[in-house]
Amino acid sequence: MNAPRHYLQFKDFSRAEYDYLFSRTRWIKDRFKRYEPHHPLFDRTLVMIFEKASTRTRLSFEAGMQQLGGSAIYLNTRDSQLGRGEPVEDAAQVISRMSDIVMIRTFEQSIIERFAEYSRVPVINGLTNEYHPCQILADIFTFIEHRGPIQGKTVAWVGDSNNVCNTWLQAAEVLDFQVRVSTPPGYEVEPERAGLIGTGHFAHFDDPMEACRGADLVTTDVWTSMGFEAENEERMRDFADWQVDEDMMKVANPGAVFMHCLPAHRGEEVSAEVIDGPQSVVWDEAENRLHAQKALMEFLMIGKIEGDCA
C-alpha cells in the first residue's frame, strides 16, 4: 500500500502542482456553472472532524464531496471518543480504515500531523491555529480569476499574524510573490512558527498604509481568532489603527482587490465601505472554497487527470 499524500501546509505541494490545481479548479467550476455532473469520487467517503466550529469549511467540504459523487460524514470531538481522551493515533487508524479521505479542523497543528502519520488515507488541514491552506488555495484561485497570475504580485496583510497570514507567507515562497505584513507591536510574524524557509518574500511594515501602498491585493482577518477570546478586549485596543478602510484601498494599485476569509466584523478589521465595495471579491472567494477543495480532494485521491484541464 502506497503512503497517502496529505495537505497539512501550503508548502506540501510544488508550484507545478498548484498550477495544475488552479487549472483543475477552473474546469470543475465551469462544469458546476453549466450544471454538468462530475462524479470521479463515486461511492467514496469523506470524514470531517471538527474541534473548531465552522460554516464555510463544513458546507464547502460536505457539498463538494456530494457534488463529486461521494458522501461526507460529520464528526465533532464533543460527540466522539476523540473528545473523551482516545489517542489521536488510535482514532486515525480506525477512521482511516472506514473512509477514503479525512478533513480535520482543530486547534493544534501537532494533532493533525499525528493523525496523518497514522492514517491510511489522505488527510486535509481544514484549519489549525498555525495554518489554513485550503483558504489560501481558494484565495489565490480567486485572484487568478480576477487579475491573472499571482507570481510577482504584492499582497498586503493588515492585522493579526495568524494562521491565514502564516499560510499567505508560505504561499509567497512557493508561488514567488511578495507579502507585506503590518501588525501592531507584539503581534509580528514569527518566521519559524509560520514554517518559512527564509524571509525574502515578506516584509514587515509598522504603518498599515505603507503596507497597502502599491499592493495588488489587500487582505485581513478578524482581530480575535477562535481560542483567543480571553484577549478580545485587549486586542480591540491594540488593533484599532489596523482597520482596512477606503484610504488604505486608495493607496493600493488601482486594480487591487480586497479579500477576507470570513466571517467579518464590519467596523473592526474592515470598514463596511471596503468589504461591500467594488474592490471586494469576498463572495467569489467564499464560493471558490467549494471548487478549489473539490479539485484538492480529487487530486489527493486520484492524482492528476490529463486532458480535461484547459
Where are these regions (language model features)?
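Glycine-rich phosphate/diphosphate-binding loop of Rossmann-like nucleotide-binding domains
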Residues: E51-A63, E145-T220
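Adenosine-phosphate binding glycine-rich loop
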Residues: G255-A256, C261-A310
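Rossmann-like adenosine-cofactor binding region
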Residues: I197-A272
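Active-site-proximal loop->helix
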Residues: I73-I95, Y118, Q170-A171, E188-G200
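Active-site cofactor/substrate anionic-group-binding motifs, chiefly glycine-
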Residues: T45-L46, F50-M98
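Anion-binding alpha/beta catalytic cores of soluble intermediary-metabolism enzymes, centered on
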Residues: A92-I95, D100-A171, H260
